[in-house]
UniProtKB/Swiss-Prot annotation:
SUPFAM superfamilies: D-aminoacid aminotransferase-like PLP-dependent enzymes. It catalyses: L-leucine + 2-oxoglutarate = 4-methyl-2-oxopentanoate + L-glutamate; L-isoleucine + 2-oxoglutarate = (S)-3-methyl-2-oxopentanoate + L-glutamate; L-valine + 2-oxoglutarate = 3-methyl-2-oxobutanoate + L-glutamate. Transmembrane segments: none annotated. The gene is ilvE. It holds the Pfam family Aminotran_4. One of its GO terms (cellular component) is cytosol. The keyword Transferase applies. The modification N6-(pyridoxal phosphate)lysine is found at K154. GO terms for biological process: isoleucine biosynthetic process; L-leucine biosynthetic process; L-valine biosynthetic process. This is Probable branched-chain-amino-acid aminotransferase. Its EC number is 2.6.1.42. It comes from Rickettsia bellii (strain RML369-C).
Length: 289
């Protein structure tokens, strides 16, 4: 996609410049391309405003710092760059992708000459592919322990396993994979956080072994404001059969019903989506004003 609805060129913000879509390229020897040394965010703009932009931007900078990357712009400058990009591309509802990466000055693992670069891209929000809900299977791949990879950094390296797991799920006829942590407890889906419901109580894994999603945090806040109890616990795979409902949360999908999870010896079906639907509606009110 290279043009917007008014047939003007799309632009991507790169290191302080608005670059036409077709010219927004990187060198073949880009360090982060070879070593996954980049961090990014996934954001949504509604009616021309990015939801929780400050929180996303602060997390972007923090993610970079965890990897030892010094972002050459402060939070306020990155926020203003978002606003400039949205105005330039004349879009209201969009998916936003900020990225911080190392340049092509060296292929050494560590080199003080490596530059740190920033881009922000915005494309129109795509129609939701799983409006009717989706079906999961349990991936054979486990999340790395927090002392192996920094889980609160939204690093490209984390997504190697996510890609592998989701591809396997798709090949087997499922929509996505449920990931377990290094001890076998439920963690998350490949790119989203997961919630379960029983007796009007929300259960969700403790977010110390995976990225604590901003949408996840928002849904917990909404649920508590509605008077719902939320329990963050270590959840075992066999507990899935005890729940009546399941849903996933994420910037791109917002709140998405999960219809079933194949746990190996059986498929657990979820038919009661009433609480998820209420949370979905309330979330929509907040993000769309």
């Amino acid at each position: 996609m290279t043009k917007n609805s008014e047939n003007n060129l799309w632009y991507i913000w790169i290191n302080g410049e608005l670059v036409p879509y077709e010219l927004a390229t990187v060198h073949a020897l880009t360090h982060s391309l070879h070593y996954s040394g980049s961090v990014f965010e996934g954001e949504r703009a509604y009616n021309g405003k990015v939801f929780k932009l400050k929180e996303h931007t602060e997390r972007l900078v923090k993610s970079a710092e965890v990897l030892g990357l010094k972002v050459p712009y402060n939070v306020e400058e990155i926020i203003k760059a978002h606003e400039l990009l949205i105005e330039k591309n004349k879009i209201q509802d969009a998916y936003i992708r900020p990225l911080v990466w190392c340049g092509s000055e060296s292929l050494n693992i560590i080199n003080p000459k490596l530059s740190t670069n920033v881009l922000i891209a915005a494309v129109p929000s795509m129609p939701r592919a799983f409006a009717a809900g989706f079906n999961l299977y349990v991936s054979r791949w486990r999340k790395a322990a927090p002392n192996m990879m920094p889980v609160q950094s939204k690093s490209a390296a984390h997504y190697n396993m996510a890609i592998t797991s989701k591809k396997e799920a798709k090949d087997l006829g499922y929509d996505d994979a449920l990931l377990l942590d290094y001890e076998g407890y439920i963690a998350e889906c490949t790119t989203t956080n997961i919630f379960f419901v029983k007796d009007n109580v929300l259960y969700t894994p403790i977010a110390d072994r995976f990225l604590d999603g901003i949408t996840r945090q928002t849904i917990i806040e909404i649920a508590k404001n509605l008077g719902l109890e939320v329990k963050e616990e270590r959840l075992k795979l066999e507990q899935i059969e005890d729940f009546i409902s399941c849903f996933a949360t994420g910037t791109a999908i917002e709140v998405q019903n999960i219809n079933s999870i194949d746990i190996g010896n059986k498929k657990v079906i979820f038919n009661d989506h009433k609480i998820a639907d209420v949370l979905k509606e309330e979330y929509g009110k907040i993000v769309r004003g």
